[in-house]
Amino acid sequence: MQRGKFITIDGVEGSGKSTQIDFICDYLVTKKINVILTREPGGTELGEKIRTLLLSTDIQSIHGDTELLLLFAARNEHIRTKIIPSLEKGDWVLSDRFTDASYAYQGGGRGLSIERITQLEKWVLQDFTPDVTLLLDVSVALGMSRVESRGRKDRIELETNDFFKRVRNSYIERSKQFPKRIKLIDASKTLEQTAQQIKIILQVL
């Protein structure tokens, strides 16, 4: 049986991931491809509990290193018990965020050591990597205006604009570092125009 493809989709808050995830799933279904939709943090019973902890506004402060370790603990469980088994069955897996988010949010946003993140990545992922990463890019101003329209914010969404500017810059640097895997998509365009950019990438997978 042919191994499935692993697609990740990432970007700052308000980049439109949820809408484009729906488009990707619908597109793959038309191609008779079985797709497993998952997310980080989350995707497993343990991961979802960690997600609740990390996003809860009831917790006033979490040390950056603690946050990073919890994310990689959830990621390890996610990879071992859901992503790899699904790929080995021939399913395609689409994950809302993956390791690039740790470099952007914890590395760029929080200012944690990139070397430390890389060490955790090598330990947890080993040689495992997505087939393609769709990086939806919007300005922080546009992204946060979309977040404001959704109503109540989680712990991460309550961060400052400067935090999200650092996150965005880190994402862009990652796309320059890994241009073959990370496809930078202008998500400030209409939903249809953004989806068309994604469709072109999916057609050559």
From Swiss-Prot:
ATP binds at residues 11-18. It is an enzyme of class 2 (transferase). Keywords: ATP-binding, Kinase, Nucleotide biosynthesis, Nucleotide-binding, Transferase. The keyword Kinase applies. One of its GO terms (molecular function) is dTMP kinase activity. Its EC number is 2.7.4.9. It catalyses: dTMP + ATP = dTDP + ADP. InterPro entries: P-loop_NTPase, Thymidylate_kin-like_dom, Thymidylate_kinase. One of its GO terms (biological process) is dTDP biosynthetic process. GO terms for cellular component: cytosol. HAMAP family: Thymidylate_kinase. NCBIfam families: DTMP_kinase. PANTHER family: THYMIDYLATE KINASE, UMP-CMP KINASE 2, MITOCHONDRIAL. Phosphorylation of dTMP to form dTDP in both de novo and salvage pathways of dTTP synthesis. Belongs to the thymidylate kinase family. This is Thymidylate kinase. It comes from Ruthia magnifica subsp. Calyptogena magnifica.
